[in-house]
A protein has these predicted regions:
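Composition-driven recognition of low-complexity segments enriched
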Residues: 41-44, 52-64, 74, 79-81
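Anion-binding and metal-coordination hotspots
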Residues: 58-71, 82-472
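A short secondary-structure junction motif
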Residues: 21-25, 72, 76, 431
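Basic, short loop/linker segments at the boundary and entry of helix-turn-helix/winged-helix-like folds
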Residues: 5-52, 57, 393, 397
């Protein structure tokens, strides 16, 4: 067996790494029971090593792994040429979430002890990974209701046929048909229940447009990098800066990233036991809520704020206001009590209002000034006038953040975000072709993502070790 692979083969290193970790939690279920026939319980180190090694090969199918164990040298060496069936492999992968999370954190601890990670500075990014959803499984309320009714009819018919069977006839085929019918009904019922929940959360005008996949109810229709749309999950990845190791990974059904930053930071801290000092993310995470929450944690957020010009462009177009008269073109005067428009007219502070938890000062021009102005149509737009402009009253945390993002050294630091934060996506989706989950459901998708993260970290560690010169 030793001649199957070289001494520096990745399978050997993965076996050694898994041997350094406490995997007892994986084997908690392997207990003998009096009066019951024993079944083989494969060692956790073996199954963990097989899955990590397989993901580094870009193989995510339990059936494919079971076939490859007959000829792939690394898998043959790990299993000592023993055959492990696909059901055992598949059940192990998704059946030990808590143990897997503990193992992931243990390995990060070993990397920290080796001095190859910088847990003070984190980088965060998200990517969409397609779900295991059938092409024709995306249905609305009426179709799913019909599927449930039809499923119940089929089961009643099969039960009646089973009751009428003569004694001595082989009923295995009929039993399999009944089992398949019940599973189909359960999927339709789960999808219908999910759809009703989503309808309750949607705006009344959008409820009739809600759709759910019958084969993958948790998945959501999300925009893909190529501009298309597909039923997917949103994978949130947190990476440390020094060696690009993943320190946290999570899977959500939210198409928008804005609310995922703080849960990701908390997960990374739980995995490492170290409170980060800085987090770098793209502008999709730059919200006032995230600025305030990171400030409360003494966590420095580096994420480019969308300028007033970019935020207001759509609003100006909808309201018939020329870009030259957008709110950002009005200049403050007298300590923020007045604004001056591009045409030289004064706007006076008239009130303070709150939108989505943010205080805004409202400035308004004199009606006579707007009525006499030759730029009235371009400035006042569809509203007609007098012109009003709102300005956010920024909190101390927001002011500090905006000032920070103007510093040259911070801008230079942000330029490194892409090559670090997006590298795990390139490894998983580009190199290893992991562009679709191989398991169903949000929980199991999260478990598979953690296996991918573990395999990625191990592959990074193998790369780092290979670059270390061997002492003579």
């Amino acid at each position: 067996m030793e001649s199957l692979i070289d001494l520096d083969h990745p399978a050997r290193t993965i076996w050694e790494i898994s041997g350094e970790l406490d995997l007892s939690r994986f084997e908690a279920h392997c207990k003998a029971r009096e009066g019951e026939a024993g079944r083989p319980c494969w060692p956790a180190q073996l199954l963990v090593s097989i899955w990590i090694y397989s993901y580094t090969l870009g193989v995510a199918s339990a059936r494919a792994i079971a076939r490859m164990m007959k000829h792939e040298p690394g898998l043959r060496w790990l299993s000592a040429d023993q055959e492990i069936n696909a059901h055992t492999l598949g059940d192990f992968r998704v059946g030990h979430q808590a143990a897997l999370e503990e193992m992931f954190a243990q390995f990060l601890g070993l990397l920290d002890e080796a001095g190859v990670v910088d847990l003070r500075r984190l980088l965060h990014d998200g990517t969409k990974v397609k779900a295991v959803a059938g092409r024709g499984s995306y249905h609305g309320l009426r179709t799913l209701q019909d599927r449930v009714r039809q499923g119940r009819k089929v089961i009643r018919k099969l039960d009646q046929e089973a009751a009428a069977q003569h004694e001595g006839m082989d009923g295995k085929h009929e039993a399999a048909k009944r089992r398949a019918a019940r599973e189909a009904l359960q999927r339709a019922q789960a999808a219908l229940e999910k759809l009703k929940k989503l309808q309750a959360e949607a705006a009344p005008s959008q409820q009739q447009n809600v759709r759910v996949s019958e084969s993958e109810p948790d998945a959501r229709r999300m925009k893909q990098p190529d501009g298309g749309w597909a039923l997917s999950y949103n994978v949130q990845v947190t990476t440390e800066a020094q060696s690009r190791m993943i320190v946290g990974i999570g899977v959500t059904d939210a198409g928008n990233d804005t609310q995922e930053l703080m849960p990701a930071v908390e997960k990374a801290q739980a995995n490492t036991g170290v409170a980060p000092e800085q987090v770098i993310a793209d502008n999709g995470y730059a919200t006032r809520a995230n600025v305030e929450q990171t400030s409360e944690r003494n966590l420095e957020l580096i994420a480019p704020w969308k300028t007033d010009e970019s935020r207001e462009a759509g609003a100006c177009q909808r309201n018939g206001i020329a870009a030259a008269f957008g709110p950002s073109q009005f200049r403050g005067q007298r300590g923020g009590q007045k604004l001056q428009c591009p045409a030289g007219k004064k706007l006076i502070l008239i009130q303070q209002i709150t939108h989505h938890g943010v205080r805004n000062n409202v400035f308004e021009a004199r009606p006579a000034d707007c009525n006499r102005c030759r730029w009235r149509k371009a400035c006042c737009g569809k509203r007609g006038g007098p012109r009003r402009v709102e300005r956010a009253v920024e909190s101390p945390a927001m002011k500090q953040y905006l000032e920070r993002m103007q510093r040259p050294e911070v801008k230079q630091l942000y330029r490194k975000r892409c090559e670090i934060a997006e590298f795990p996506h390139l490894w998983a989706k580009g190199v290893k072709k992991w562009r679709r989950f191989s398991v169903r459901g949000l929980v199991k998708a999260g478990i598979e993502a953690l296996w991918v993260a573990m395999a990625y970290n191990v592959s990074q560690w193998l790369r780092i070790k290979s670059a270390i010169p061997v002492a003579a």
